[in-house]
Structures are given as C-alpha cells and as structure tokens.
Amino acid sequence: MDELCKEYNKEHPDINFHTNYDSSGTLMTQIKEGAKCNIFFSAGVEQMDELEKGYDGGSVEKDNRKDLLNNQVCLVTWKGSNTKVKSFKDMSKAKNMALADETVPVGQYTRKALINSGLVSGDKEKADDLKDTDISKVLGGLEINSCANVGAVAAAVAGGADEIGTVYYSDTFGYEDNLEIIEKLPNSLTGDVIYPVAPLKSDDISDAEFNASNEFIKFMSEEKAVKLFEKYHFSMS
C-alpha cells in the first residue's frame, strides 16, 4: 500500500495518506469504536459485511464498495526445516504450527479448509468457532501457537519458531529466502479469498474527503495499481 500511495501522489501531491496496518478484525473494531477512517481495505468479506450493517456514527458506502483483489492461502514452512509435512492433510506430522486466531481472515479461511478437507468435523458456516484446542486435538496433539495477524504467522515460521503455518500467497513476498510453500490451498477448501475496499461515511468525514476516497479507490483498479498488486502476488477480482 505504501508504494501505491506514493504512485498516486505523483499525480495528486495534495493528498495526504495516513495508513494503519493490522488484521481486518482489529481494524474493524477500531472503526466501530470511533477511529476515524476514510477507506477500509479488508482482507476478508466478513469484516466489511459487518461494517456495512452500520455502526455508531458511521457506515460503509456500499454502492461504492468493490471486491478488488483475490489472494490464496498457502501452507508454509521455513527453508531447511526438513519437515515431513508434504500437504495440508499431513499437518499432524509437524511439531508445531503458527495459526492466526479466529478473528483474523487468514485464520478463518484456514479453519474453513480444515472442515472442508475433512480433517475437522463441523459446520463450515461456524468455522470461526473452531478453537485452537479443537484443532490440536484432531491433529494428534499438534502444538498450535496463536498469532494476532498473518504477519506474525509469517515471521514465526520464517524465523523457525514454528514448523508450519498458513499465510496468504502475497505474504510470501520478501520471504523467498526464508519460507518454502508446501501447498497453495484451493478455493474449494478455503472459499474465495476476496479483498473488498469501500469508502466510509461519518459525521467527521467531509464531502471533499469522501470524494477523494472514491477517486483513490478508482485508481486502485487502474493499470499502474494493477501492476503493483500483481508484483506482490495478488490477482484482480
């Protein structure tokens, strides 16, 4: 996003960006609790849907909401780990796993994959209720180390603290020397991994700010932006 903002500023130097990066669940909570935000760019549809219901003092402008990007969940290990895990269904062969918690989109997608693959029994619509203890039990006592966001998962596995973990394909960018992809999970297991974006409206957001937000969102689908997204392993939705 920093590169994208810099590219946009080349033609719009009057626009000032103040970016806040965290898990989509954390960002959603911050917005609902009153943090000012002009644009919400989420790694999960569920968090955007929740804000679209409305919150105290603001709302998602749903007519301008756009499903912008696609991603893919990957099972990874650290390079040189000599893990016995060769696929998602082999995860019980690992000693430990870094897993984003159930409020984080990549953690939610992973839990859906566990159910859809038959590794864990349950209702895929209630995948978010699947706790680490449940996962550990069905995977033969695999040690699950909960992470607050996908970046923490990538760092834990790349640093060798955990043998395996699930991250987005985009999160492997920059870790080529440290991470090895064991398997890219098919969407039939995870569901579509969609990144929606939308402008927000609230009492403290001016019409000028709202219009500027819409212009930037339009730019996010233009050729210069597409090339940047593809560089980081995203595809356009």
Map each language-model feature to its residues.
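Exported/periplasmic ABC-transporter solute-binding proteins
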Residues: 1-12, 16, 25, 45, ...
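Ligand-binding clamshell of periplasmic/extracellular solute-binding protein-like
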Residues: 19-29, 36-52
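CheY-like receiver
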Residues: 30-31, 156
